[in-house]
């Protein structure tokens, strides 16, 4: 069977998706291995449309079944911002975290928030299935933890009261928005959402 393409150049996302798909019994490949970068515009109105666009474009270009995601952080005090613009709030992860804290400084705490993730699986003929997941918590004022990426060091997950950067990868990959989106995708596939999909019913976690 041809490999499944993970369509991201974000090394943190790539690592998580590889771990979440590890027991699927599939060969996995990625954009770095294939030398592909279509510079897909991530300017859609919502996470579904952006994940759909990335997955379908890379599936068509590669001829491979392709999985892609789009994720955003929604903060209640900022009326759901940065949302789909989370990755474009500033130039890199540290400056994005600093900018978010700057924007929140004038608002009373707690700064409740949630990550939302859409995962799209696309076939080379244009067929697509989507999964969605979220993870609730709040933004904290000081970075904590050495793991994770993005906003993880300032996002305290509601159930554990630890930031996502404080969680071991195995634990994060059981409760994160991305893990829940992949679980949701697999559940939809098990109900026949995408006949011929290379992915199996839910067994990860």
Where are these regions (language model features)?
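Anionic-ligand binding patches
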Residues: 2-5, 11-205
């Amino acid at each position: 069977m041809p490999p499944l393409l993970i369509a991201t150049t974000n090394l943190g996302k790539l690592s998580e998706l590889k771990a979440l798909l590890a027991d699927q019994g599939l060969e996995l490949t990625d954009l770095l291995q294939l030398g592909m970068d279509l510079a897909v515009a991530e300017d859609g109105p919502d996470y579904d449309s952006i994940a759909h666009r990335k997955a379908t474009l890379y599936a068509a270009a590669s001829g491979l079944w392709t999985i892609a995601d789009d994720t955003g952080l929604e903060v209640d005090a900022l009326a759901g911002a940065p949302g789909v613009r989370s990755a474009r709030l500033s130039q890199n992860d540290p400056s994005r975290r600093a900018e978010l804290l700057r924007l929140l400084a004038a608002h009373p705490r707690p700064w409740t928030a949630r990550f939302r993730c859409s995962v799209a699986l696309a076939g080379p003929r244009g067929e697509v299935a989507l999964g969605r997941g979220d993870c609730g918590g709040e933004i904290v004022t000081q970075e904590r933890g050495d793991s994770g990426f993005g906003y993880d060091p300032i996002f305290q997950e509601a159930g554990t009261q630890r930031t996502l950067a404080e969680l071991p990868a195995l634990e994060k990959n059981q409760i994160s928005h991305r893990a829940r989106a992949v679980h949701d995708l697999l559940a939809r596939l098990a109900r026949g959402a995408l006949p011929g999909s290379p992915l199996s019913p839910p067994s990860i976690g």
